């Protein structure tokens, strides 16, 4: 059984290039990568039908002589060329199918053969068969014809010398494998016409030389621009492979006659005048040089005469082209050259992903990076800098796709879009504004939110539910119309920054709370910068005006420096003086919010499309499972919809409003709690309704894989060969398991901990994170990985505490994020190797030396400064030179008693670990003291 065809083999059979066939296969949806890829038999059959239909559907044109130089055409597929030898005096218009009747169609073999010998008294150039060199002038000529070949160079060489042996035609006259057209009838036969070299000969018959034969060096190329009425000494020009009909069959061939001159094989002179009377290859009207003396080699397809460089095959051309594309040598490894090509890679991509983009070997990329000083594996997520470095070395422009672009491309692959309203303007309806309150911690932001809730919600319903959901709606009576306003109760502005960074347009207006008795604080300036970066209009609430020290005008002047100019000063920012504690001017603040929304924003959305929104908060409820707080931005969310929120997905089983009531649907700007997700989503993740659960699961899985790759690339430290020895040393690692009350808290805590920079000797590794209480599973994981569990606003449940005590797992509970960060930073510093510095404690001078057989030399010393201690390190200095750097005091005595130290002004005897001592030597005692790490 024959093996499968490869792409280049099939391309050769179909007569196309491998590049064209590869492009066609990829358009058909077949999985092929290179020209060496195998092709299944059904695909081979389909490609043969495809190219067969393509060839039959378009008119064929005569191939150029160079294109036919190396192959024998099949007469059943490639008939005689439209440039067959024209008669000197055409008799009439050619038969249908000839090039004269249909310039864009290829003549049949019989018609072309009949048109060649036809002759009449009156020549008709318009009806004559097309001549080479005129093909470019015909309007229906194909672009494949090359008229430059027909027009020869001026001053051609003379034809072959007289006496040349007759040459056999290129095609084997005894071959019966190809079908040949019948001999032309009617008119003067080619044998009756005078030939260029004399009488009709074997090479002068009206049969074409073999198209595949190659003319010898110097064989004539006739100048194919002879005029129709010009005198023709030979009765016509010698045919060329592009102009002559196919060789007739042996039964149709005329008998051979005497050989004539000028019987050059292959492409002899074209239909121009081959020479003067009786002169082989003499000058004719725009005639070309005649062919050289032909040989029998022409009958077998080999050139006669001096050798000529043959035409390169497709394989040779392809090899030369690939050789021109010299590979880049990066670190001693040959890699493909990009030539400035742009490559898009996702954040956290691996070298295997890079290699797949450029059709290279991932192992070669690993070796190249290793030689460049970077140590990574093929499947390891690498940083953006490493990808840029490798791309620059190979001349590729690496573009790391941002998370927003990557998510948009992911949704487009599922034919989904996020962030645009569907339909026309008449489909859009008004929606309530979404307002976020920002400001300094002590400026009354929380009190303002509580005041608004108490005025619009009953005191019995304003408890934990509203605080827990983090968002609520209030109604404002403006000009007799009740208008709802949605408030986000997200503590602090860190979550606001994260949402802006993700591009979520969840906030329409920001209320900036500034205390009238305190002024503009650093967090106030930070909040202003957040609002400006998000291009959100700001309404300033000057709070605490009921205090005696309040200075509202001073606040207005300070905020003017930051671009918030009050309306009374000629600006466009609304300022409202309020007292959140007294409930003063709260209605005016809400009206100012609505006026700003009407003047600055187009608050419209399509309520009839599939819902899209944003998750502002998510947590794990013990009885209800993962719960996400959603604000619908456009469309309507209904119970039963299949949704995907970040890397979490599920079906909406239940929706709860800010009052704890169940709702069946939520329109634009409506905050609700959604139950039914499979996992806890992240704060700021986008919500999208899809058609089915399978699509939601696929989107969530791909987002989760992307997030893990990006996290791995961000947390991985670049290891180079220079610091390999340091890396291989024992490194202290603090493993942590984070548990929090909601996803936003866990995310903020994780980001803050990963930003702690202590030293390269210690590392922080967060092995697990989650929402909810500390479970027994967390304890077992911490015990196996020697980790510390950090619980933020949560406690342990069940037997988790007992398991932690039994296995020695440390669980730390925190309710303030800054305290958790400080303690973990201190723990990391405590894991550092201590740094010691030298501290001098005293000096002594050797006054006398005693010898003892038991201990050796004893130095009698006087303590000059400080004190000396037993076992202390000493430095022995003689004449200003250090004799010993790290000697120790092995024995210390005062009189006859062993002592631990001797103070300044006292004599003592000591035995040193360094025996080479002399009188007058100076002893400097010191100790190594640990220095606290910053």
From Swiss-Prot:
Gly residues bias located where?
260-303
Where does it mainly reside? cytoplasm
In this chain, the stretch annotated as G5 covers 579-581
Provide the alphabetized UniProt keywords: Cytoplasm, GTP-binding, Initiation factor, Nucleotide-binding, Protein biosynthesis
Superkingdom as given in the UniProt entry: Bacteria
> Region entry G1: which residue ranges?
439-446
Q: Where in the cell is it found?
A: Cytoplasm
**Compositionally biased spans, kind Basic residues:** 308-317
Keyword Protein biosynthesis found: yes
Task: Using the UniProt annotation, give all residue ranges assigned to the region (G4).
Answer: 543-546
Q: Which InterPro entries match?
A: EF-G-like_DII, IF2_II, IF2_N, P-loop_NTPase, Small_GTP-bd, T_Tr_GTP-bd_dom, TF_IF2_bacterial-like, TIF_IF2
Give the compositionally biased regions (Low complexity).
80-154, 185-197, 206-231, 238-250
Q: Where is this region: G3?
A: 489-492
| Record domain tr-type G: where | 430-602
Residue numbers spanned by region G2:
464-468
Q: Where is this region: Disordered?
A: 54-323
Q: Which GO terms describe its molecular function?
A: GTP binding; GTPase activity; translation initiation factor activity
Q: According to its record, what are the GO cellular component terms?
A: cytosol
Record: residues binding GTP? 439-446, 489-493, 543-546
Q: What does this protein do?
A: One of the essential components for the initiation of protein synthesis. Protects formylmethionyl-tRNA from spontaneous hydrolysis and promotes its binding to the 30S ribosomal subunits. Also involved in the hydrolysis of GTP during the formation of the 70S ribosomal complex.
Can you tell me which family this protein belongs to? Belongs to the TRAFAC class translation factor GTPase superfamily. Classic translation factor GTPase family. IF-2 subfamily.
Instruction: Return the protein name.
Output: Translation initiation factor IF-2
- Where does this protein come from, organism-wise? Corynebacterium urealyticum (strain ATCC 43042 / DSM 7109)
């Amino acid at each position: 059984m024959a093996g499968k065809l490869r792409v280049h083999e099939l391309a050769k059979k179909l007569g196309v290039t491998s590049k064209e066939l590869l492009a066609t296969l990829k358009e058909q949806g077949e999985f092929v990568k290179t020209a060496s890829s195998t092709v299944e038999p059904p695909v081979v059959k389909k490609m043969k039908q495809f190219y067969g239909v393509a060839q039959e559907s378009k008119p064929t044109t005569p191939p150029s002589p160079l294109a036919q130089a190396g192959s024998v055409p099949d007469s059943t597929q490639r008939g005689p060329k439209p440039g067959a030898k024209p008669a000197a005096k055409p008799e009439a218009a050619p038969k249908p199918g000839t090039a004269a009747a249909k310039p864009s169609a290829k003549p049949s073999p019989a018609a072309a053969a009949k048109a060649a010998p036809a002759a009449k008294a009156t020549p008709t150039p318009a009806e004559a068969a097309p001549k080479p060199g005129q093909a470019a002038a015909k309007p229906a000529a194909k672009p494949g014809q090359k008229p430059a070949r027909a027009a020869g160079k001026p001053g051609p060489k003379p034809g072959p010398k007289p006496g040349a042996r007759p040459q056999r035609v290129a095609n084997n006259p005894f071959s019966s494998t190809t079908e040949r057209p019948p001999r032309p009838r009617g008119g003067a036969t080619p044998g009756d016409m005078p030939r260029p070299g004399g009488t009709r000969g074997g090479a002068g018959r009206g049969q074409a030389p073999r198209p595949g034969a190659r003319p010898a060096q110097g064989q004539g190329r006739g100048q194919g621009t002879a005029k129709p009425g010009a005198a023709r000494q030979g009765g016509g020009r010698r045919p060329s492979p592009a102009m002559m009909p196919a060789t007739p069959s042996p039964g149709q061939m005329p008998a051979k006659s005497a050989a004539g001159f000028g019987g050059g094989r292959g492409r002899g002179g074209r239909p121009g005048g081959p020479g003067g009377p009786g002169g082989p290859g003499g000058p004719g009207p725009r005639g070309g040089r005649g062919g050289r003396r032909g040989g029998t080699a022409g009958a077998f397809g080999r050139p006669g005469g001096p050798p000529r460089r043959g035409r390169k095959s497709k394989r040779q051309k392809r090899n030369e082209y690939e050789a021109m594309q010299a590979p880049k040598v990066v670190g001693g490894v040959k890699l493909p050259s990009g030539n400035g090509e742009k490559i898009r890679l996702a954040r956290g991509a691996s070298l295997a992903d890079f290699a797949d983009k450029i059709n290279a070997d991932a192992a070669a990329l690993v070796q190249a990076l290793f030689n460049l000083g970077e140590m990574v594996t093929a499947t390891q997520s690498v940083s953006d800098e490493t990808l840029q470095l490798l791309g620059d070395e190979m001349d590729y422009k690496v573009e790391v796709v941002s998370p927003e672009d990557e998510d948009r491309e992911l949704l487009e692959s599922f034919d989904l879009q996020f962030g645009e309203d569907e339909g026309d303007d008449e489909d859009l309806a008004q929606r309530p504004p979404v307002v976020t309150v920002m400001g300094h911690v002590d400026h009354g932001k929380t009190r303002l939110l509580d005041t608004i809730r108490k005025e619009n919600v009953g005191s019995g319903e304003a408890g934990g539910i509203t605080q827990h959901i983090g968002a609520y709606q209030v109604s404002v009576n403006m000009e007799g119309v009740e208008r709802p306003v949605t408030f986000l109760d997200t503590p602090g502005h860190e979550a606001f920054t994260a949402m802006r960074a993700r591009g979520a347009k969840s906030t329409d207006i920001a209320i900036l709370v500034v205390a009238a008795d305190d002024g503009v604080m650093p967090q106030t300036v930070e909040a202003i910068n957040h609002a400006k970066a998000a291009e959100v209009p700001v309404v300033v609430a000057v709070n605490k005006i009921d205090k005696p020290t309040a200075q509202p005008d001073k606040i207005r002047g300070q905020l003017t420096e930051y671009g918030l100019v009050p309306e009374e000063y000629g600006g466009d920012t609304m300022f409202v003086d309020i007292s959140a504690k007294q409930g003063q001017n709260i209605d005016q603040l809400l009206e100012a919010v609505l006026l700003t929304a009407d003047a600055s924003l187009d608050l419209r959305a399509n309520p009839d499309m599939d819902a899209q929104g944003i998750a502002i908060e998510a947590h794990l409820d013990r009885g209800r499972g993962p719960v996400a707080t959603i604000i619908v931005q456009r469309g309507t969310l209904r119970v039963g919809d299949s949704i995907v929120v970040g890397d979490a997905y599920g079906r909406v089983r239940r929706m709860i409003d800010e009052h704890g009531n169940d709702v069946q649907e939520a329109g634009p700007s409506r905050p609700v709690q959604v139950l039914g997700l499979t996992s806890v989503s992240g704060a700021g993740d986008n919500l999208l309704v899809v058609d089915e659960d399978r699509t939601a699961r696929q989107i969530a899985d791909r987002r989760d894989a992307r997030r893990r790759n990006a996290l791995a690339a961000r947390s991985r430290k670049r290891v180079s060969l220079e610091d390999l020895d340091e890396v291989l040393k024992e490194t202290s690692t603090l493993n942590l398991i984070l548990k929090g009350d909601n996803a936003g808290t866990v995310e903020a805590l994780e980001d803050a901990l990963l930003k702690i920079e202590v030293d390269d000797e210690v590392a922080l590794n967060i092995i697990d994170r989650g929402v909810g209480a500390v479970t027994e599973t967390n304890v077992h994981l911490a015990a196996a990985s020697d980790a510390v569990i950090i619980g933020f606003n949560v406690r342990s449940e069940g037997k988790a505490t007992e398991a932690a005590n039994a296995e020695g797992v440390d669980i730390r509970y925190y309710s303030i994020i800054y305290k958790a960060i400080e303690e973990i930073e201190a723990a990391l510093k405590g894991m550092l190797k201590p740094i010691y510095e030298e501290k001098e404690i005293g000096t002594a001078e050797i006054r006398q030396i005693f010898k003892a057989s038991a201990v050796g030399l004893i130095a009698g010393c006087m303590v000059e400064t400080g004190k000396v201690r037993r076992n202390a390190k000493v430095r022995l200095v003689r004449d200003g030179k250090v004799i010993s750097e790290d000697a120790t005091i092995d024995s210390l005595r005062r009189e006859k008693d062993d002592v631990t130290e001797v103070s300044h002004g006292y004599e003592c005897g000591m035995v040193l670990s360094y025996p080479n001592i002399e009188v007058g030597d100076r002893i400097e005692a010191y100790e190594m003291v640990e220095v606290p790490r910053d």
